[in-house]
């Protein structure tokens, strides 16, 4: 699913920047509240890395939130670009404890369901219908080696 692909993408970003794992940690965060980073983008693949691990983490989160909101595909109407892909009402929870990380992505489903998903990410925010019955979530756990440690 799209949510699974996005969660895997964030885990890959965290693995490529293990020195800043705590900078990726977010709890019940809504991508719509994100402010775009200032200045030139950081890139882990640049020949001359011009940003710190923390700056790269902030930029990774900003890029990832744009993907969650659907900015990879846009429709332009009356000169205004609007995302046409992405998850409906996404919430994000990223936990880092030592080298163990969990990435949870929640979104609003099309209809109510009897049994809620096991993930509590996004629950209780009033975004997923009455009693969170339209709450959907995917949660991935992984281990990220520390800086200089090969997996």
Regions found by a protein language model. Name each.
Residues 2-151:
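Flexible, low-complexity segments enriched in proline/glycine/serine and punctuated by aromatic residues
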């Amino acid at each position: 699913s799209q949510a699974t692909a996005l969660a895997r993408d964030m885990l890959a970003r965290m693995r490529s920047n293990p020195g800043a794992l705590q900078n990726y940690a977010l709890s019940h965060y809504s991508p719509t509240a994100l402010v775009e980073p200032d200045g030139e983008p950081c890139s882990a693949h640049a020949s001359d890395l011009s940003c710190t691990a923390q700056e790269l983490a902030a930029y990774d989160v900003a890029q990832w939130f744009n993907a969650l909101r659907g900015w990879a595909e846009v429709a332009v109407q009356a000169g205004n670009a609007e995302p046409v892909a992405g998850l409906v009402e996404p919430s994000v929870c990223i936990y880092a404890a030592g080298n163990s990380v969990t990435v949870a992505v929640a979104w609003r489903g099309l209809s109510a369901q009897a049994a809620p998903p096991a993930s509590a990410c996004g629950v209780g925010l009033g975004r997923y219908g009455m009693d969170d019955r339209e709450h959907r979530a995917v949660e991935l756990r992984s281990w990220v080696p520390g800086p200089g440690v090969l997996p």
